[in-house]
Amino acid sequence: MSGKPLLVTCGLPYTNGPCHIGHLRTYVPADFYVRYMRRSGEEVVFVCGSDNHGTPIVISAEQEGSTPRVLSERYHEHFYETFRRMDVVFDRFGMTDDAMNHETTRSIVERLIENGYVYAETVSQSYCPDCERFLPDRYVEGICPHCGAVARGDECDQGCGQHLEPGEIKDAICKVCGGKAEYREQEHYFFRLSAFREFLLDYLPALGGTSTARNYALGWVKELLHDWCITRTLDWGVKFPGRDDLVVYVWVDAPIGYISFTKEWAQKAGADWKDYWCGDETGVTHFIGGDIIYHHCIFWPALLKGAGYGLPSAVVASGMVTIEGKKFSKSRGYVVWTNDDYLDQGLPADYLRYYLLSYTNHTKELDFSWKVYGERVNNEIVGTLGNFIYRTMYFAEKEFSGVPDLAPRLEVIEEIERSLAAVDGLMRDYDFKNAVDAMMTLASFGNGYIQNNAPWKLIKEDRAAAEQVIADCLQIVKALVLVFEPLMPDAMQRAWTMLGYGDDIADHAIAEATAPVGARPLAKPSTLFAKVEKDQVAALEATLNERVERANAAAAPKMPVVSIEEFGNLDIRIAKVVSAEPIKGSKKLYKLVVDLGSEKRQVVSGIAQFYAPDELVGKDVALIANLAPAKIFGVESRGMILAAGDEASLLVPLRPVKPGTKIR
């Protein structure tokens, strides 16, 4: 045990849209960690809340004719209920727009002002003359001055990830009306982040959590630290002290929410919030997505230091999520919604929790695939863990009517102890994937133990020996149920009850895994886990594919209307592929020779990733024959092969057609 109270927080979900599985990469591991630490004897408080301020919420509320508060409350309830369904249970889930956070934020900002870490400065800020308003943050879009990518006003989210100050973005466009923005001067307030460079260089190397968080932050600090503008020209948000026309920047009041939510919890629990946020030895651990490392490892500890608060002891940053091998994108349809696509389809929260924690290392990119999901559920959860628990309890109930009154063999206890020690070390290192693997290794040991000892055969010759085997296996079952509970709480509570215990498994420590199960009657067991059927996986894949197709159709640029005469200018003919070979230095291009009946031509086509050369030879394809010749990768191309979609599906005739036939 650590000997000090632990406080675990999660990055705040933004109340601007529904929960998807990308969100869960932060919240499920945090809940897993909290449950495990509590079952290991640690005192842990788990707080979070919704992030309610900032320009995106104001814009969304304006677009739907609502108010930011109404929009925030709606999605706050949505996230609260979704987390409950996913068995992510916080001690406090607050709102950054609640009175406590307004009060705490203003208090901390006032202290920063008193300590000399905030100053006023007149800056150029984007202004839309058509809308007659200043354009903070996401009200404006333009070009990142650092890398040239398309960026929003406060962050280069599509490119280098750098924080952008007001006035830095180039070629600014108003997101409200689409008009060109101009720059006008306005007074704002800045936090002296640059004053904390030496502090951060000393603090970050000792910061616990994942190495990605430390290393990324150190890289940024070693380069250059700019002071942060901490005010915005908005009506919605926490008012900056002494200025009714300015609010505090959302990345100030959002992390301060961690403190506010701790205060709210402490008021109800009769505890002292200062035990967690004041003093040199705090036990604060932040679970965040990898895209907000800068805010949590640089800006946040500097702000806390400047205001005289304690500092986080660990930051655990996750990798990003991809969908079926594609970059996560709501606009392109590559998204899996937690409720609509998963929970509302009757799929267990336990299965998704397992997938998110066992798929890969927490800091690496996680790809969500429905096919892989089905395979892992069926092979690992059902086939390994569920199979061992069920066959053990079924045999115990059938042959002995309950748990034999026998102590487990020493070798079984030692194997359980080895497994639990491995799990404990990995959990405290935030190595969740390998911790889950170590748990599943114990289940595999159990399967091997019962299979090798074959009590169904042994009972015919030596009933006492068979009874000992089952007592050993039931001890392994107990250990598995206790250690898997933080990962799959619903299923393990049911398994605990089947073992004959009538209380809440959460009231028991993992250390009880080696205490004898004890003689007790067992009811006929039921299966803990159901397989995911192939037709269900196919239906879920179809839903995702349809969403992607709809998104692609909606995003497709609308082409201008052309006359029949203009279309007639295109000479589109059927051509037969005579040969196909890769172009040196390119992974995408083929050099094709095609037969047009009256002549043969050389054409370059970008279909190498989708077809082997021998698949193309002899195939009839559609060719634009009067396209101006061009050199592509140094190879002359006289025409264009027509193909459809991202997978480059070739357009071919349904019946045999002579090469050179014109398409009309």
Swiss-Prot record:
Pfam families: Anticodon_3, tRNA-synt_1g, tRNA_bind. It is found in: Cytoplasm. Zn(2+) binds at residues 144, 147, 156, 160. GO terms for cellular component: aminoacyl-tRNA synthetase multienzyme complex; cytosol. PROSITE patterns: TRBD. Binds 1 zinc ion per subunit. GO terms for biological process: methionyl-tRNA aminoacylation. GO terms for molecular function: ATP binding; metal ion binding; methionine-tRNA ligase activity; tRNA binding. Signal peptide: none annotated. CDD domains: Anticodon_Ia_Met (cd07957), MetRS_core (cd00814), tRNA_bind_EcMetRS_like (cd02800). NCBIfam families: metG, metG_C_term, PRK00133.1. This is Methionine--tRNA ligase. It comes from Methanoculleus marisnigri (strain ATCC 35101 / DSM 1498 / JR1). The gene is metG.
